[in-house]
Amino acid sequence: KYDKFEYKDYKKLNNYSKKNKIQFMTSLFDTNSVEIYSPLLSVFKISSSDINNIPLLRKIGKEKKHTIISTGASKLNEIKNALKYLNLPPKKVCIMHCVLNYPTKEEDAELNKISILKKNFPNNIIGYSDHTVPDENLITLKIAFDLGAKIIEKHFTHNKKLSGNDHYHSMDTQNLLKFNNLI
């Protein structure tokens, strides 16, 4: 109920983003949504659960827009196949390392996979989608950045005590300011 948006909500978010010079994007989970929401988006996001969704990959690829693809639980050959079906220039695709545990323990973040992705996909942008609970030093994010993650995705909340499945492991304003100063 609290995390479902309708078209009018996306339109409102898109307008707010444009007004504030923020690039608007969202994850889409079916081909119909690509048709409906593409006019609002300059970037597509493909969730880890859709890395093998060939119709969705092809549909998004035909839009010729920048695309971010999460790779949680994926093998290298699955990532290669996803890129083949997207059929986009490498610089238009960011491959995001992530772990599908919510929250992820710092020791389970497998940050070495950022280097593996950089080695196997040298022409793509490599990023990191983080699901760890922010610690005082934001060490996981700092290491990911130092390893070369060009895009860092972190859930954000204005109140970590809100109900829902993301708020407690999300970044808040203080975490964001601290991370900005770290890098």
Where in this protein do the model-derived segments appear?
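Catalytic cores and adjacent flexible loops of soluble metabolic enzymes
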Residues: K1-I183
